[in-house]
A protein has these predicted regions:
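A short beta-turn/loop motif at secondary-structure boundaries
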Residues: 38-41, 112, 134-138
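Short aromatic/hydrophobic contact patches that present stacked aromatics
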Residues: 73-75, 106-108, 144-146
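Conserved catalytic-core motifs of GNAT/GCN5-like acyltransferases
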Residues: 67, 108, 126-142
Length: 150
């Protein structure tokens, strides 16, 4: 399986939304949120996809907040999970953040999402806080992770 990572484009929107719909732990953006992201062409936002010969297998979206990057959404297709795709996506995002002078990367993750938490901890993200009741759909806390880059 040959994998490649590239910047997402508006043509990727249907595949991104389809993948996200089947990823229970993804952020579940609306079509309007994705469309606005692609329309804005903002240097403060980065969207990457990982794909193979059969198409899109995952994506990550981050935004710049005062020299820190916030990971807003990350998802990997069900059949592609546990094969290192999330690790590769996150590695590429961190490389880009470092290359653009970021001081740190942070994110929120569901307390119950053990697989994602293990991925972030593998990259040396540290738990830096908790947002009580952050996920309203299940009244679940968010764990805030942060990785210093400098």
């Amino acid at each position: 399986m040959k994998l490649s990572i590239r910047s997402a484009a508006s043509a990727d929107l249907p595949a991104m939304m389809s993948l996200e719909k089947h990823a229970a732990t993804a952020a579940h953006w609306t079509a309007q949120q994705y469309e606005a992201m692609f329309r804005a062409h903002s240097p403060e936002r980065t969207a990457l996809i990982i794909e193979d010969e059969s198409g899109l297998q995952g994506f990550v979206i981050a935004r710049v907040v005062h020299r820190e990057w916030e990971i807003e959404n990350i998802a990997v297709a069900g059949p592609a999970r546990r094969r290192g795709l999330g690790t590769r996506l996150l590695g590429e995002l961190l490389d880009q953040a470092k290359g653009r002078g970021a001081d740190a990367v942070f994110l929120e993750v569901r307390e119950s999402n053990r697989a994602a938490r293990a991925l972030y901890e593998k990259w040396a993200f540290l738990e830096s806080g908790r947002r009580r009741g952050y996920y309203k759909d299940q009244d679940e806390d968010a764990i805030v992770y942060r990785l210093g880059l400098t």
